[in-house]
From Swiss-Prot:
The keyword Transferase does not apply. InterPro entries: Pancreatic_hormone-like, Pancreatic_hormone-like_CS. GO terms for molecular function: neuropeptide hormone activity; neuropeptide Y receptor binding. It comes from Tapirus pinchaque. This is Pancreatic polypeptide. The gene is PPY. Hormone secreted by pancreatic cells that acts as a regulator of pancreatic and gastrointestinal functions probably by signaling through the G protein-coupled receptor NPY4R2.
Length: 36
C-alpha cells in the first residue's frame, strides 16, 4: 500500500502545502481505486 504523505506543518510554504495536497489526492485515489 502507498505511504500516507506527511503533513508539512502549519508554517509550511505554499509550495510544500501544494505538494502535500497533490500527494494526498494521489494517495486517496490509490486507496479508493476498486480492486478487481
Amino acid at each position: 500500500a502507498p505511504l500516507e504523505p506527511v503533513y508539512p506543518g502549519d508554517n509550511a510554504t505554499p509550495e510544500q502545502m501544494a505538494q502535500y495536497a497533490a500527494e494526498l489526492r494521489r494517495y486517496i485515489n490509490m486507496l479508493t481505486r476498486p480492486r478487481y
